[in-house]
């Protein structure tokens, strides 16, 4: 993988990730394909929304179908028939989400398989091996996603262990002869001094890109913005920056304003299945009775398959009848909305008009522009 940086507007960056499998224009949003599928969508439909890279989930694919089944097909690209690049998370977030059924040690994490209750152990080395078998174009180190809230002492211990695990991840990745990209993950909760230590430690080890982890886990938005404003300038300018698990459309806008290049989140697909649809002027909750006789398109400014062909009344009808097609059409629209948003941000950065784009984005939704505390 090669990262090319074209231009900046304030702290926002316009560039691209170049892979053997294709080029990804940045800033970018990566749809989440947890089990080797973006829920309800064929790879061709995902690509048609404008997505150039997707995310797969190491933890879930390790449990089902497992490494051996994956290797029978070649790798994850062959298994799911996605032709473009794939980023896989390390499994750390899912393991730490298991709560009481897991035990963290210096060596790794002991837990019970949530499917059948069998005892399982996952460590940095195993995570690198699974992601190698998946053929991931971007591999994420194995780390502990520090929960929120966490006091300073806990956050410090967690961050320091994640640094040690980052070194082990790097060593196993290299010993496997993996020619793809490996990203480090910056931790430290909401504490700037801990984030400083994490960034420096990861840069000293050396990675192909750097993710900001441990945000969007319940902390106030002001804390997320503050940490991004503090951390992003410390990440080497020639490396891509990835904000993990984020987020709402406004979170993508605010991340880009602060220098983030890559995002992923289940929100557009999950919300689509619940009838919560993103449009230029805000949100449409399609199961609301007021849409029963609305013959207009979901979003008049959207060019997706759903908006070009179907009315709000039809989408409302499908939702009320729990029809699978409704979830699919909603997902197509939400994913296209996110890709159109990212394309708009990229164009605005190219033209040096980002703040004008941001102002218009919020005004269309009747909201104030959040403050930006950068030099």
Swiss-Prot record:
Record InterPro entries: ArchSynthase1/Queuine_TRR, TGT, TGT-like_sf, tRNA_ribo_trans-like
Pathway in which the depicted protein is active: tRNA modification; tRNA-queuosine biosynthesis
Catalyzed chemical reaction(s): 7-aminomethyl-7-carbaguanine + guanosine(34) in tRNA = 7-aminomethyl-7-carbaguanosine(34) in tRNA + guanine
Effect the entry attributes to changing residue 90 to C: Loss of activity
Binding positions (substrate): 89-93, 143, 187, 214
Keywords: Glycosyltransferase, Metal-binding, Queuosine biosynthesis, Transferase, tRNA processing, Zinc
Mutagenesis or variant effect for residue 307 to A: Loss of activity
Gene3D superfamilies: Queuine tRNA-ribosyltransferase-like
The keyword tRNA-binding appears for this protein: no
Zinc in keyword set: yes
Outcome of mutating residue 264 to A/N/Q/K/H: Loss of catalytic activity
EC number: 2.4.2.29
Biological processes annotated in GO: queuosine biosynthetic process; tRNA wobble guanine modification; tRNA-guanine transglycosylation
Molecular function, one GO term: tRNA-guanosine(34) queuine transglycosylase activity
Cofactors (names): Zn(2+)
Record region (RNA binding): 245-251, 269-273
Effect of residue 304 to A: Loss of activity
Result for mutant: residue 302 to A: Loss of activity
Active site: 89 (proton acceptor), 264 (nucleophile)
Cofactor info, note text: Binds 1 zinc ion per subunit.
A GO cellular-component term linked to this record: cytoplasm
Residues reported in the UniProt entry to bind Zn(2+): 302, 304, 307, 333
Homology family: Belongs to the queuine tRNA-ribosyltransferase family.
Role summary: Catalyzes the base-exchange of a guanine (G) residue with the queuine precursor 7-aminomethyl-7-deazaguanine (PreQ1) at position 34 (anticodon wobble position) in tRNAs with GU(N) anticodons (tRNA-Asp, -Asn, -His and -Tyr). Catalysis occurs through a double-displacement mechanism. The nucleophile active site attacks the C1' of nucleotide 34 to detach the guanine base from the RNA, forming a covalent enzyme-RNA intermediate. The proton acceptor active site deprotonates the incoming PreQ1, allowing a nucleophilic attack on the C1' of the ribose to form the product.
Protein name listed in UniProt: Queuine tRNA-ribosyltransferase
Gene: tgt
